[in-house]
Amino acid sequence: MEKKINLSGQELNYDETGNPTGRPVILMHGWGCELSTVRSIARILEPGMHVYNLDLPGHGKSPEPASVWGVYEYADMVQEFAHSLNISDPILVGHSFGGRLAIVLGSRGFSSKMMLVDAAGIKPKRKLSYYIKVYSFKTAKRVLPLLLGHERGQKALDAWRGKAGS
């Protein structure tokens, strides 16, 4: 069931589902997303967990903050949310930007367990071939228009991009 709470003047929309006696789980979506993005995860957890699925400020049905917020302000808000509802040691599930929040909150000792889903702030291990591909294209992007002219250079880049896949 979707609910709203006011935290230090910031309204926060959230969905509370699952087993009220289960371990609390706080779901945090990625940047530019909303709570529906991770609702499929909530459904899996609901039978045994007490799930709080947040619409982070400026996303979904939660209004934007009055000032510019960074990662730490969002993390503070998640902690205030948990404190106001007497949630202790929740399991944090963070997708993308939500994963970055989970990392910050974990570093504060807020939670003893977390699950990161494609989390921002974690650099994936890459093979040398990846870097060769990326930096070759970046170099070609600057050089080909100079060598071939803008139009022919752009066509060559488009053809290369089509073969490379992105």
Task: Indicate where each model-derived feature is located.
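Gly/Ala-rich beta-loop-alpha elbow adjacent to hydrolase catalytic centers
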Residues: 94-98, 102
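Active-site loop/oxyanion-hole signature of alpha/beta-hydrolase fold enzymes
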Residues: 15, 53-93
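Conserved catalytic-core motifs of eukaryotic protein kinase domains, centered on the activation segment
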Residues: 37-39, 62-68, 125-128
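N-terminal cap/lid segment of alpha/beta-hydrolase-fold proteins
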Residues: 1-11
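Hydrophobic, aromatic-rich cap/lid helix
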Residues: 153-166
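Flexible "cap/lid" loop of the alpha/beta hydrolase fold
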Residues: 103-143
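Conserved HGGG/HGGXW glycine-rich cap/lid loop of the alpha/beta-hydrolase fold
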Residues: 10, 15-61
